[in-house]
């Protein structure tokens, strides 16, 4: 016997549950089918006596992420600021350099020009890319055929900014520079507010976390929906050839609906059989957008000893020998459960996954002791980690990335409906895609597409702006006059050559006027 409803939502992460909540609040009968034994998708809050609670998946929120902040507030959740009071550390070539601000400073004048030009150039290129249609950028084809490795080599004159740009790609996208399309990268950074916003803690994407963990968002929506959320129900078959759409799960339950919302990573669409088959371009798209590789690691200590040394816990670590490339303070807001969270990303995640959990912890502690200059780092009291590459119902983390050539060929089909199937998931968002904010935007947009299809709202209400959060207001990202107008290294060299030529001509003219040149 089939279970009947108005809408089946495939996927019980934040995007699917945000869609289900909006549809439920609009009076529709909705069922959510989640493959795992818990909701949350790529967010997961672990609870035990050693950690109280810890986010092993998506966790951070900040200014301009207004949808997730609004939804969390509706659900009764509060945020707290991630510690960013003390100094950060940039560890490079075996030495630690304290700094403040979003980016480590460059003391070499030539390197400073190169660093500054890298961030300004990437932000300027991003301004040419439409957030809702990156394939329409004037130079979309050229940029999409280029890897980020090629773009960094093209922009950077010196090695230091090239290496830091590589770390930036590894950290933000959990992929290697040769794996990622320059167009997709530039779009991704642009729709997150630019290079400074995406990398910053204060006034950036990592400013805050949720008290009690981000997993509560999905859990509280599940509590509102009750038995409409079905766990351990992997969807394996969707048939929309009849009057209703039939959705079958791995345990052979069949749900009959008017519409379906797919709120899973695009690549997981390959686990579902469709009748009729997906259109050609959509069918090929889902096999061409892999997810990144990351192991999230949290080391606990008896106290936040790094703060005594005037360090906030943020470490930017360069070098192939270092297991993690970025850390942050993960101590609870009341100062309890002192911890440092680190990210093993991209090829390092694939490499270090071969080690045991104990071996990874040892490497982390040895690295932290070296970077922080403290043997206290060698004395952890507890350790938790999550290898997202192992998750068959995620495929990786944080998000799907687009290899070269894919965005311009297939990008326009990412959220295009297929019959009575609509597509959500953070990858389909146009603002903070890859984050919890993007998940909410995508889920609510897909829900409004369904509401439009049944005649409840007009088409022009599908996409809706979001008012700025009163509790977490955004400050503008500013640059100095010098940062905006400094030349690149090649520009400086051209200026020097031009100045030299002009000076030589002027001296020659002056000498001739004064009769100092020999007459032949």
Curated annotation (Swiss-Prot):
Subcellular locations according to the entry: Mitochondrion outer membrane
Cofactor(s) named in the record: FAD
Record-linked InterPro entries: Amino_oxidase, FAD/NAD-bd_sf, Flavin_amine_oxidase, Flavin_MAO
Catalyzed reactions: a secondary aliphatic amine + O2 + H2O = a primary amine + an aldehyde + H2O2; (R)-adrenaline + O2 + H2O = (R)-3,4-dihydroxymandelaldehyde + methylamine + H2O2; a primary methyl amine + O2 + H2O = an aldehyde + H2O2 + NH4(+); benzylamine + O2 + H2O = benzaldehyde + H2O2 + NH4(+)
GO MF annotations in UniProt: flavin adenine dinucleotide binding; monoamine oxidase activity; primary methylamine oxidase activity
Mitochondrial intermembrane side: 517-520
Site (Important for catalytic activity): 156, 365, 382
Enzyme Commission number(s) of this protein: 1.4.3.21, 1.4.3.4
Topology within the bilayer: Single-pass type IV membrane protein
Modified residues (S-8alpha-FAD cysteine): 397
Transmembrane parts of this sequence: 490-516
Keywords: Acetylation, FAD, Flavoprotein, Membrane, Mitochondrion, Mitochondrion outer membrane, Oxidoreductase, Transmembrane, Transmembrane helix
GO cellular component: mitochondrial outer membrane; mitochondrion
Ranges in the topological domain labelled Cytoplasmic: 1-489
Modified residues (N6-acetyllysine): 52
Domain of life: Eukaryota
Function: Catalyzes the oxidative deamination of primary and some secondary amines such as neurotransmitters, and exogenous amines including the tertiary amine, neurotoxin 1-methyl-4-phenyl-1,2,3,6-tetrahydropyridine (MPTP), with concomitant reduction of oxygen to hydrogen peroxide and participates in the metabolism of neuroactive and vasoactive amines in the central nervous system and peripheral tissues. Preferentially degrades benzylamine and phenylethylamine.
UniProt family annotation: Belongs to the flavin monoamine oxidase family.
Subunit relationships: Monomer, homo- or heterodimer (containing two subunits of similar size). Each subunit contains a covalently bound flavin. Enzymatically active as monomer.
Protein name, per record: Amine oxidase [flavin-containing] B
């Amino acid at each position: 016997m089939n279970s009947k409803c108005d809408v089946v939502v495939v996927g019980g992460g934040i995007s699917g549950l945000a869609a289900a909540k909006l549809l439920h609040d609009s009076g529709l009968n909705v069922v959510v089918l989640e493959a795992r034994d818990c909701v949350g998708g790529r967010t997961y809050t672990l609870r035990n006596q050693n950690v109280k609670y810890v986010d092993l998946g998506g966790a951070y929120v900040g200014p301009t992420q207004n949808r997730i902040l609004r939804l969390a507030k509706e659900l009764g959740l509060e945020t707290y600021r991630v510690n960013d009071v003390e100094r950060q550390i940039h560890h490079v070539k075996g030495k630690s350099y304290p700094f403040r601000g979003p980016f480590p400073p460059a003391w070499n004048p030539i390197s400073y020009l190169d660093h500054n030009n890298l961030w300004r150039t990437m932000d300027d290129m991003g301004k040419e890319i439409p957030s809702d249609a990156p394939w329409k950028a004037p130079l979309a084809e050229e940029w999409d055929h280029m890897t980020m490795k090629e773009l960094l080599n093209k922009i950077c004159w010196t090695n230091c900014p090239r290496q830091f740009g590589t770390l930036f790609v590894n950290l933000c996208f959990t992929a290697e520079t040769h794996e990622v399309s320059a167009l997709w990268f530039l779009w991704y950074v642009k729709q997150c507010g630019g290079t400074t916003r995406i990398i910053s803690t204060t006034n950036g994407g990592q400013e805050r976390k949720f008290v009690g963990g981000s997993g509560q968002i999905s859990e509280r929506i599940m509590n509102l929906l009750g038995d409409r959320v079905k766990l351990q129900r992997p969807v394996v078959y969707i048939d929309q050839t009849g009057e209703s759409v039939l959705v079958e799960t791995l345990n052979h339950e069949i749900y009959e609906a008017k519409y379906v919302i797919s709120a899973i990573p695009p690549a997981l669409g390959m686990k579902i059989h469709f009748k009729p088959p997906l259109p050609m371009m959509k069918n090929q798209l889902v096999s061409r957008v892999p997810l990144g590789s990351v192991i999230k690691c949290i080391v606990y200590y008896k106290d936040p000893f790094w703060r005594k040394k005037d360090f906030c816990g943020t470490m930017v670590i360069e070098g192939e020998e270092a297991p993690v490339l970025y850390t942050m303070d993960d101590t609870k807001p009341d100062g309890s459960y002192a911890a440092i969270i680190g990210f093993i990303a991209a090829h390092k995640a694939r490499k270090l996954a071969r080690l045991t959990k104990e071996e990874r912890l040892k490497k982390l502690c040895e690295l932290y002791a070296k970077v922080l200059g403290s043997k206290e780092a060698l004395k952890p009291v507890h350790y938790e980690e999550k290898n997202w590459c192992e998750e068959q119902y995620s495929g990786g983390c944080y998000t799907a990335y687009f290899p070269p050539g894919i965005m311009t060929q297939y990008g326009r089909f990412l959220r295009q409906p297929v019959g009575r199937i609509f597509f959500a998931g953070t990858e389909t968002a146009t603002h903070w895609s890859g984050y919890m904010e993007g998940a909410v935007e995508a889920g609510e947009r897909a829900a409004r597409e369904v509401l439009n299809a049944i005649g409840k709202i007009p088409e022009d209400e599908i996409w809706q702006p979001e008012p700025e959060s009163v509790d977490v207001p955004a400050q503008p990202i500013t640059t100095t006059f010098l940062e905006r107008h400094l030349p690149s290294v090649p520009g400086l060299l051209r200026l020097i050559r031009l100045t030299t030529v002009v000076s030589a001509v002027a001296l020659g003219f002056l000498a001739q006027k004064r009769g100092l040149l020999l007459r032949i």
